[in-house]
């Protein structure tokens, strides 16, 4: 759709497109064409932002820049800031004046504002303050306990049972000192994968021996319970995605 709009707006301009539909070998060829033949417009996904250094690029635009802020991951702000600063940094690299235009529904968001200014210190202060408030790493550890199975109702009921078990276990003195908190269950961001539904609980606590042993016991106990036949339970620590 964006390519169609660009061709209507700039019918005489050459446009190159680089995204997942172009082959890996084609990426290099596209970039060489963009640089060598001075094709004025390069349209692409996030891959365009990373590691490209063209001195004649003077204008960069980012569409829906804040979408990645609202994914269910504690690193969302950091990743969005990193991506936007890379994009903004593509313009004006050869001594020419550069300009970046960022489309956003939340122009007052600290991440967007700091990225537009390339203000790393201000972003760090804002992000570290938010992580401390929410008990995100590095101030605590996040363990995602996911239950999966083919019947959504059973999966949800099992996840509720896992939550209650976790809350009981976290009352033990060796765990309570870390002020653990159990959240959920909630559907995974992509709730159904390969015909299996996924619901998960989140344990906020410390990555210490007592916690690891408790989670290992939980996995074994879940697996041997006949009520959980056909379902799986797995644990991620500070999950990247």
Give, region by region, the residue ranges found by the protein language model:
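Nucleotide-binding motor/catalytic cores of P-loop/tubulin-like NTPases across gene-expression machines
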Residues: 170-179, 193-197, 209, 222
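A short, contiguous, amphipathic alpha-helix enriched in charged residues
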Residues: 13, 154-170
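Short, charged interaction patches at domain edges and termini
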Residues: 199-216, 231, 240
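Short amphipathic alpha-helices in soluble, non-transmembrane regions
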Residues: 158-164, 213-221
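A carboxyl-terminal module marker
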Residues: 164, 168-170, 178-193, 233-240
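Inter-lobe coupling/hinge segments of SF2-like helicase ATPases
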Residues: 1-156, 189, 200-201, 209, ...
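Surface-exposed amphipathic alpha-helical segments in non-transmembrane regions
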Residues: 120-122, 128, 166-171, 208, ...
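Conserved RecA-like helicase motor-core motifs
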Residues: 9-21, 173-183, 232-234
């Amino acid at each position: 759709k964006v390519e169609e709009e660009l061709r209507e707006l700039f019918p005489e301009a050459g446009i190159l497109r680089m995204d997942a539909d172009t082959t890996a070998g084609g990426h290099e060829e596209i970039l060489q064409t963009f640089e060598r033949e001075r094709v004025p417009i390069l349209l692409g996904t996030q891959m365009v932002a990373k590691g490209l250094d063209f001195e004649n690029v003077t204008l960069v635009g980012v569409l829906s820049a804040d979408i990645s802020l609202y994914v269910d991951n504690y690193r969302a702000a950091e990743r969005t800031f990193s991506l936007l600063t890379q994009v903004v940094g593509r313009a004006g690299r050869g001594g020419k004046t550069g300009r970046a235009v960022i489309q956003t529904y939340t122009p007052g968001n600290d991440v967007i504002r700091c990225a537009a200014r390339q203000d790393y210190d201000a972003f760090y202060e804002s992000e570290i303050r938010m992580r401390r408030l929410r008990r995100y790493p590095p101030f605590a550890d996040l363990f995602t306990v996911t239950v999966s199975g083919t019947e959504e109702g059973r999966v949800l009921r099992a996840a509720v049972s896992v939550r209650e078990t976790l809350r009981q276990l976290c009352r033990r003195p060796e765990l309570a000192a870390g002020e653990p908190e159990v959240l959920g269950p909630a559907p995974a961001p992509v709730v159904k994968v390969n015909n299996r539904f996924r619901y998960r609980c989140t344990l906020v606590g410390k990555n210490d021996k007592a916690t690891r042993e408790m989670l290992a016991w939980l996995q074994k106990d879940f697996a041997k319970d006949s009520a959980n036949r056909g379902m799986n339970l797995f644990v991620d620590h500070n999950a990247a995605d």
